[in-house]
From Swiss-Prot:
Protein name, UniProt field: Putative pyruvate, phosphate dikinase regulatory protein
Enzyme class (EC, first level): transferase
Database matches in InterPro entries: Kinase-pyrophosphorylase, PPDK_reg
Organism: Geobacillus thermodenitrificans (strain NG80-2)
Record family assignment: Belongs to the pyruvate, phosphate/water dikinase regulatory protein family. PDRP subfamily.
E.C. designation(s): 2.7.11.32, 2.7.4.27
PANTHER family: PYRUVATE, PHOSPHATE DIKINASE REGULATORY PROTEIN 1, CHLOROPLASTIC
Nucleotide-binding is among the record's keywords: yes
Length: 266
């Protein structure tokens, strides 16, 4: 069987149309179809040239053009030249618009935009896991945001929440016996946020944490004198850095995240 040609025309990359064409071609033994992709078409001149080529080569045109004017031009030009042109995405857009009572944006490349956004989120989530709890201080200088605070100030959940907003977050625990990593004093203060909490609230949280682990809630970890020592040390560190401090005593993670994002936009 002679190989036949299909021109895949798109105002984006053309991957969607090519996959559909290849899926259809796979239904024929030996798949006697050659696909030529014509991506990122923005003008009618290019469409007319493709129609002329399709006529000359007795080819089919399969296309994904989201702008109605471009779709109509291609269909009209193809019909005039006796070329078969198949609209892959247009009818579905119109059906969805009618059924859902929504107006399409008619903007090319939106799948690619969504894919990029998705991968940015995944990258940020992986970053937050990798640089959680001061595991690797090298992440401090690579982060969009650096969170610091004593234990149980919601650093990890806040890091994950911000990661879902496509922000790369590293967090560092502040402990009197451990010298803060030098990178903490090299990062710009505008990227660093200290998480402050009242001693009473922190005591309550830590005691509940110990109970949930089946441990004695009178351990040094949940001792008021120890907590005050940690918070005093924290105050010294954030003062040295010169970063903003947010009181998270009675704030939900979402509320704290909102404050941070607003400060970043300044």
């Amino acid at each position: 069987m002679n190989q036949r040609l299909v021109y895949v025309v798109s105002d984006s990359g053309g991957e969607t149309a090519e996959l559909v064409v290849k899926a259809a071609a796979s239904q024929f033994y030996a798949s006697p179809v050659q696909v030529k992709r014509v991506p990122y078409v923005e003008d009618k001149t290019t469409l007319a040239e493709v129609v002329a080529l399709a006529k000359m080569n007795q080819a089919i045109i399969a296309f994904t053009l989201v702008v109605p004017e471009m779709r109509e031009f291609l269909l009209t030009e193809a019909a005039r030249e006796g070329v078969v042109a198949y609209d892959i995405i247009g009818p579905l857009i119109e059906k969805m618009s009618d059924l859902f009572q929504l107006k399409p944006r008619y903007e090319p490349g939106q799948v690619r935009v969504l894919d990029e956004d998705y991968f940015k989120k995944i990258e940020a989530i992986e970053f937050a896991v990798k640089y959680d709890d001061g595991r690797d201080p090298r992440g401090i200088l690579r982060a969009d945001i650096v969170l610091i605070g004593v234990s149980r100030t919601s650093k990890t959940p806040l890091s994950q929440y911000l990661a879902h907003k496509r922000l790369k977050v590293a967090n560092v625990p502040i402990v009197p016996e451990v010298e803060p990593p030098e990178q903490l004093f090299q990062v710009g203060p505008s990227k660093c946020f200290g998480l402050k909490i009242s001693p009473d609230k922190l005591l309550s949280i830590r005691r509940e944490r110990l109970k949930s682990l089946g441990l004695n809630d009178q351990a040094i970890y949940a001792n008021m004198d120890r907590i005050k020592e940690e918070l005093a040390y924290f105050d010294g560190v954030v003062k040295k850095i010169g970063c903003d401090v947010i009181d998270v005593t009675n704030k939900a993670v979402e509320e704290t995240a909102s404050i941070i994002m607003k400060k970043l936009k300044r």
